[in-house]
Swiss-Prot record:
SMART domains the UniProt entry points to: Tryp_SPc
All residue ranges annotated as the Peptidase S1 domain in the record: 34-262
Signal peptide: 1-16
Reactions the enzyme catalyzes: Preferential cleavage: Arg-|-Xaa, Lys-|-Xaa
EC identifiers of the protein: 3.4.21.4
Native source species: Tyrophagus putrescentiae
Enzyme class of the recorded protein, top EC level: hydrolase
Name this protein carries in UniProt: Trypsin Tyr p 3.0101
Site for Required for specificity, residues: D212
Pfam families to which the protein is assigned, alphabetical: Trypsin (PF00089)
């Protein structure tokens, strides 16, 4: 009997499913807030925006008057075919106030993988310039090339859920600080689940848990020393003591961000020149 029970135990271990990662975006009808945090006050997170259709579904960070940095997994096929169906709410701590501006174009990183979550980064261009340099509306400072967050406390903000699976909507923006986790420690924690690449870094209270970003926080910024070093990407649950949250490492994408913004400007110039020539030739004839 003991041998039979032992064999049953071995079979159960062999076929046990590893934990699955959860992308920290909500469906487009759900909302929520930071795990283990407190309400933000004016000036805490002026880079923070809410991405919305009919309601909040992801976060993002202002990086210039016309550009928002967010996570690639926040964007779906409908968004790409109809960018104008998405709005950015900024200059607010409250989801019911602030300023709404429509999205003009969306750029998802060409090598983003929804299987590995590598290159989980995207850019949104707004139809009009945002009115910045206000208490709750300031462009985030980008890090230097090669910046690799491995030590210190991340500052996170957002409207993500209190617990994994929650759908409770907060009134105000939440904030929390979370200690960074060494990449090798993080990689070991995620062994057999997902590969932690050089394009990612991790943060969480290993062995303790309780503070983290969660569903609805995806795409929001991870700040370190007042620089936008990361984008909220994925984790196993939220605030799990065994699995730190994983963030896209912004310093790996500075060239991509610059080229993407330039290509949009080049396209706009080309369109304007074509329109001018069309009108000019039409006037002559």
């Amino acid at each position: 009997m003991k041998i039979l029970l032992f064999l049953c135990f071995l079979v159960s271990v062999a076929f046990a499913k590893p934990p699955t990662i959860q992308l920290k975006s909500n469906t487009k009808s759900q909302n929520g807030f930071i795990v283990g945090g407190t309400e933000a006050v004016d000036g805490d997170a002026p880079h923070q925006v809410s991405l919305q259709h009919t309601s909040h579904f992801c976060g993002g960070s202002i990086i210039s008057e016309r550009w928002i940095l967010t996570a690639a997994h926040c964007i779906d096929a409908d968004d790409l075919s109809n960018p104008g169906g998405m709005s950015v709410r900024y200059n607010t701590l409250n989801l019911k106030s602030g300023t709404l501006v429509k999205v003009k174009s969306i750029k998802v990183h060409e090598q983003y993988s929804n299987v590995t979550s590598d290159n989980d980064i995207a850019l949104l261009e707004t139809v009009a310039s945002m009115n910045l340099n206000q208490t709750n509306a300031v462009a985030a400072k980008l890090p230097a090339k090669g910046n690799d967050p491995q030590d210190g406390d991340l500052f996170l903000s957002g409207w993500g859920t209190l617990h994994s699976g929650d759908t409770t909507i907060p009134t105000n923006l939440q904030k929390v600080t979370v200690p960074l986790t060494n990449r090798s420690v993080c990689a070991e924690a995620y062994t057999g689940i997902v590969n932690i690449t050089e394009n990612m870094f991790c943060a969480g209270k290993m062995g303790i848990g309780g503070v983290d970003s969660c569903q609805g926080d995806s795409g929001g910024g991870a700040m370190l020393n007042k620089e936008l070093v990361g984008v909220v990407s994925f984790g196993v649950g939220c605030g799990d003591p065994k699995y730190p949250g994983v963030y896209t490492r912004v310093s790996q994408y500075l060239d991509w961000i610059e080229l993407s913004a330039k290509s949009s400007a080049t396209t706009l110039v080309a369109v304007n020149i074509t329109l001018f020539l069309t009108l000019f030739i039409g006037a002559i004839w």
